[in-house]
């Protein structure tokens, strides 16, 4: 099994540095595409974005991550066809609009595997591994 590359808290790491390290990984010769997701806190509430409900503007967020669940999600992503590299950083604590919530890097053999893996992992992290409480 590949190393589980998960970090939480502290400042968001450089995606450029992550890419440099990914390109030096043991399986880098099998990787044809890297994708990075950088989620940030927005000032619009989830209910106004997803449901169209008028809502008070968000002035912050309390964000916590369950590392064990996140590690399981990463392990499962590494089992997907063509996925050879996964790295995740998630914030911790009180965040303001514009602050980074998470960064995810996926390395896979072809575009469709990379896009599918990124979409799947970010969905699992957001829906199953973190708690986001909007501050209004």
Question: Which residues are covered by each model-predicted region?
Answer:
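N-terminal, polar/charged subdomain of small-to-medium soluble alpha/beta proteins
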Residues: 1-100, 107-136
């Amino acid at each position: 099994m590949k190393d589980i590359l998960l970090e939480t808290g502290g400042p968001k790491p450089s995606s450029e540095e992550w890419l440099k390290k990914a390109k030096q990984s043991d399986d880098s010769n099998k990787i044809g595409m890297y994708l990075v997701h950088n989620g940030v806190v927005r000032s619009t509430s989830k209910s106004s974005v997803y449901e169209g409900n008028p809502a008070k503007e968000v002035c912050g967020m309390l964000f916590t991550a369950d590392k064990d669940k996140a590690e399981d999600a990463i392990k499962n992503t590494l089992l997907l066809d063509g996925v050879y590299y996964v790295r995740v950083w998630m914030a911790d604590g009180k965040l303001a609009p514009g602050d980074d919530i998470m960064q995810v890097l996926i390395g896979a053999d072809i575009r469709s595997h990379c896009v599918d893996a990124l979409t799947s992992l970010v969905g699992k992290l957001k829906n199953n591994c973190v708690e986001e409480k909007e501050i209004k």
